[in-house]
Design a protein with these regions (language model features):
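Acidic (Asp/Glu-rich) sequence patches and key acidic residues
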Residues: 1-154
Length: 154
């Protein structure tokens, strides 16, 4: 399963201005929007954005598709299991408060820690935890950036 970011923000497309602002202000990154669902779609919870990420802080760049959908029981069970595996106390409760899940898919090649950094950016706007594709734990913005920093130093 791809990396999931639990989101309290109900509309990924409407969150684009904040994502762009946070990328520059807090992540020293260039984020370019390559495409998105129309803003006036029938279900705001369902949508996508195509993004190009390039970081100045830690090595990493890539093109990604982020899709949004309603969170379901499988997502919540996966969050509970990851919390137990990773000893991430309280993070599954935060995930349970999130009505949406944003899924990150790499399109083409991503280098360095681009996906980790993008997941941190998304979590900063979504106000929910990140569930990495290996399901090993749950973490927030700080946890994602700590992993990116550690990977950049190795």
């Amino acid at each position: 399963m791809p990396t999931r970011v639990f989101s309290q923000e109900p509309d990924l497309v409407a969150a684009l201005p904040r994502l762009l602002q946070h990328a520059r202000r807090f992540f020293a990154a260039d984020l370019n929007v390559l495409g998105s669902s129309p803003p006036d779609r029938a279900s705001p919870q369902e949508g996508y954005v195509g993004l190009r990420w390039e970081s100045a802080r830690y090595p990493g760049q890539g093109t990604f598709r982020v899709t949004s959908r309603a969170a379901n029981d499988d997502d919540r069970f996966a969050a509970e299991a990851a919390e137990a595996r990773g000893r991430a106390g309280g993070m599954s409760e935060l995930a349970a408060r999130c009505a949406c899940v944003w899924t990150i898919t790499t399109e083409g090649e991503a280098t360095g820690t681009a996906e980790l950094q993008l997941s941190a950016l998304l979590a900063s706007v979504a106000l929910g935890p990140v569930l990495p594709e290996d399901g090993s734990t749950l973490y927030g913005v700080r946890g994602a950036m700590e992993r990116a920093e550690k990977a950049a130093q190795s």
